[in-house]
């Protein structure tokens, strides 16, 4: 159970304040069962089934009074397999899930697959490879699907879209680690994340053109690819440690928000140990992140840091 209040007051003459209060009662039910089968010392398999439901009873009072019932139900089953030996570690599972999302009398339901694949390969202590793949889906939350119109200030009103459906997600990671000696190690990686049929905010004229109404529409494909490396080097019998992690990210957003960015990022540090004392200098470049379901670009600043400390274990 939660209570929430939002109060907005302006200094304009003859302007009334805005009060949005909500009372929410939430009921959740979840359960799962797993059958495990050991095939050999190196192989095993499993079957898993699950069910869950969430019910939200939300009452709004104040400037924009409403009563809404939200519910989300899901159920699914998965088959999985694992194999491991001295060089290989492989895991895979495939599932089929049903999900139903309901707001008052309007409901949306879908069946969709879930896939997880991972593999690790270590031919020697100096080399190792790792890869991971995931295919799934994501439902918008209650705030993105609410039919209510809530006033935030004189110029902005918020609402949702009850007809929003699933977005599809793909994740892929590939990494390589190299450690020729104890004093030096390096790694290289590629990471990809994509989300398709993603909802984005849309702003339309409202109240005879005197304000804006923000709602959501399904009109976005989001792609992020990151390529990078990392290095660690120990000198002077391990008393001096150098580290660096350069990478580049490729953001591609299509649809209502057409965004393309390719920021470079690097984090570097040097740490020196003198008995129980340590001294560290670090630097990281400005970061840039693109949020697809908001159509927003976030930029951070460069960061410098000097540390000196003492520790004893």
Where are these regions (language model features)?
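Exposed, low-structure sequence patches enriched in small/polar residues
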Residues: 1-9, 18-313
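Eukaryotic acidic, serine/threonine-rich low-complexity intrinsically disordered regions
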Residues: 14-16
């Amino acid at each position: 159970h939660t209570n929430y209040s939002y109060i907005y007051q302006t200094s304009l003459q003859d302007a009334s304040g805005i009060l949005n209060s909500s009372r929410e009662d939430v009921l959740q039910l979840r359960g799962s069962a797993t059958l495990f089968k050991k095939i050999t010392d190196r192989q095993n398999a499993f079957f898993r089934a699950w069910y869950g439901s969430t019910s939200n009873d939300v009452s709004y009072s104040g400037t924009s009074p409403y009563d809404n019932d939200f519910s989300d139900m899901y159920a699914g089953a998965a088959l999985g397999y694992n194999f491991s030996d001295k060089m290989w570690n492989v895991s895979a599972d495939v599932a089929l899930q049903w999900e139903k999302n309901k707001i008052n009398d309007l409901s949306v339901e879908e069946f969709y697959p879930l896939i997880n694949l991972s593999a690790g390969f270590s031919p020697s202590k100096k080399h190792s490879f790792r890869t991971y793949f995931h295919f799934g889906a994501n439902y918008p939350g209650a705030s993105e699907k609410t039919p209510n119109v809530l006033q935030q200030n004189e110029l902005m009103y918020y609402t949702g879209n009850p007809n929003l459906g699933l977005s599809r997600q793909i994740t892929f990671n590939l990494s390589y680690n190299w450690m020729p000696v104890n004093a030096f190690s390096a790694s290289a990686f590629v990471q990809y994340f994509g989300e398709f049929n993603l909802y984005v905010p849309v702003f339309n004229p409202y109240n005879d053109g005197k304000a804006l109404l923000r709602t959501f529409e399904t009109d976005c494909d989001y792609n992020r690819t990151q390529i990078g490396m990392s290095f660690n080097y120990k000198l002077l019998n391990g008393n001096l440690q150098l580290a660096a992690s350069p990478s580049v990210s490729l953001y591609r957003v299509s649809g209502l928000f057409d965004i393309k960015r390719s920021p470079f990022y690097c984090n570097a540090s040097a740490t020196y140990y003198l008995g129980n004392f340590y001294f560290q200098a670090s630097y990281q470049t400005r970061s840039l992140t693109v949020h697809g379901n908001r159509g927003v670009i976030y930029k951070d600043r460069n960061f410098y840091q000097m540390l000196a400390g003492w520790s004893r274990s």
